[in-house]
Curated annotation (Swiss-Prot):
Residues 43-154 form the THUMP domain. It comes from Enterobacter sp. (strain 638). It catalyses: guanosine(2445) in 23S rRNA + S-adenosyl-L-methionine = N(2)-methylguanosine(2445) in 23S rRNA + S-adenosyl-L-homocysteine + H(+); guanosine(2069) in 23S rRNA + S-adenosyl-L-methionine = N(2)-methylguanosine(2069) in 23S rRNA + S-adenosyl-L-homocysteine + H(+). Its EC number is 2.1.1.173, 2.1.1.264. This is Ribosomal RNA large subunit methyltransferase K/L.
Amino acid sequence: MNSLFASTARGLEELLKTELESLGARECQVVQGGVHFEGDTRLIYQSLMWSRLASRIMLPLGACKVYSDLDLYLGVQATDWTEIFAPGATFAVHFSGLNDEIRNSQYGALKVKDAIVDSFTRKNLERPNVDRENPDLRINVWLNKETAHISLDLCGEGLHQRGYRDRAGIAPIKENLAAAIVMRSGWQPGTPLLDPMCGSGTLLIEAAMMATDRAPGLHRGQWGFNGWAQHDDAIWKEVKAEAQVRARKGLADYGSRFYGSDSDARVIERAASNARRAGIGELISFEVKDVAQLTNPLPKGPYGTVISNPPYGERLDSEPALIALHSLLGRSMKDYFGGWNLSLFSGSPELLSCLQLRAERQFKAKNGPLDCVQKNYHLTEKEGDSKPSTVAEDYANRLRKNLKKFEKWAKQEGIECYRLYDADLPEYNVAVDRYADWIVVQEYAAPKTIDAQKARQRLLDIIAATIGVLGIAPNKLVLKTRERQKGTNQYQKMSDKGDFIEVGEYNARLWVNLTDYLDTGLFLDHRIARRMLGQMSKGKDFLNLFAYTGSASVHAGLGGARSTTTMDMSRTYLEWAERNLRLNGLTGRQHRLLQADVLGWLRDTDEQFDLIFIDPPTFSNSKRMEDTFDVQRDHIRLMSDLKRLLRKGGTIMFSNNKRGFRMDNDGLAALGLKAQEISQKTLSQDFARNRQIHNCWLITAV
């Protein structure tokens, strides 16, 4: 009787124990990451051939205390390696674990190798050769604290490598994990099984192999016992022959079918090729189909199971796309699969909640380093005929109402960028902006008192509802998180995609970038102010300070300004402004772009202008500015500098975003200036719900 150890993925240990017992294993003991068991030589081969869940099966050879590298060397030599190595067998050492004495796994492997080789040379026997790539024997040493556990790896390559998969699709799951998912799904062999996002087909192939009694080890060409001195080839051939007979009979007797689909034609080709290599290709129908096209292949029955490992962040980099995918899958299940079961394996329980289905059972497991969950659902027959439930229904209804109102208005105004929703409902605390055929959802950061998990779930619901109501492609939705900005944080770069899209605003064409920065390059709430500047600028010299991307300069130029001067401290935004001007045909020396500290430039310049637009930050302590700036504290000093630049009869349009800003009218009067507040006049319909979003004034000489 041999003492053995079978390793497996975390979370599958009990399932593996049951499987090993069904094969005849004795004295099974579950530990984290595997099962200790006992069995004779036939059971060794049976477990290697038939275990669908084990990652590796090890034959423990001994253990030793390791307080020095010499202890490791002598402990390895305590094993009689001549009883392990067949003549001429090559080997490799896999060493894992460290302690205070063995601090490098390569060094540990080297000491083990030396000990094994020296045990042969000391007996005047031919020393075995090392073959790291394709060894006959794999010696496994695991150092746990002060104890080294020495084993013979009987598998060679991991048991998940069944031999049927050539090239996997994106982010595949291992075959033994796939087998566990099938076992836990509730699916019964003889009933239909469908995977609508099958990738390389692993779930379906593993299920078909189970259903047809095909051993998972039948297609493997190499094993870790080939160079084992105690290998019994006769027993192994018996085990293999029995597996071949059972596979042929199982395939001939099986009458049900499997269905797989995926949106990628190349992946489907690989899946079909994998199934053929596994010997069950004739049982699986593969087709290229998106989840949006998913229907029941057996609408008149019988009932079956839908199983899948949908993408959950490791396979797609767009969260809105994942949310839309899961929402769509949930609706398809309700629409077409009443009476069926559904089982999904995912690394994101939040995404599974987008299905809007209640799970009956769930299991936990690891997919590599990822904590994952498998949830099983039953779709009642009435659900298959019912209208899918609406995600975030109150929010969806409000967004639908706003869309009807603003879409028509925006078309009449000649604008392609506008706000559709601005935290209208307190529990759905986001802003939703349209930029042509793109949507930007800005999440206002939740207070620390709000549970982070609940806030994330609410956001997922919002994104799903937004995509559903607006009918946009998921890749046309951009998600941002907005917090209170300090200084120039709103200008910090968030991405390097560099994707610009062209949008229309009245008679202007402008470039916006929806992904690389917190803001997009166009402040939508200043839309009317920009139009006013265009109407006021004919024949005038126009100065645009803290100009950002120069959209106000574009409107002034299109309005017939004699010249435009666009100033900002950022070279990036000035280059953006230059692109905006050029897009509208505003080129030439009369359209200047200046990179400068605005406040310092104002104090030093003696230039004169007829129309000045200034939209300073609420507060700034930029290293590139000479001192700090606070718009409430410093606006009169700012007006004093601006007055020097203002020609007789000229106008300053002064705007800021400080809530509760108070204009110092007495201070203005002392400068010989007066102010007319136009804050409400510059708010368009889409911002009427937020009357404090900006302050705006026209300032002229008395």
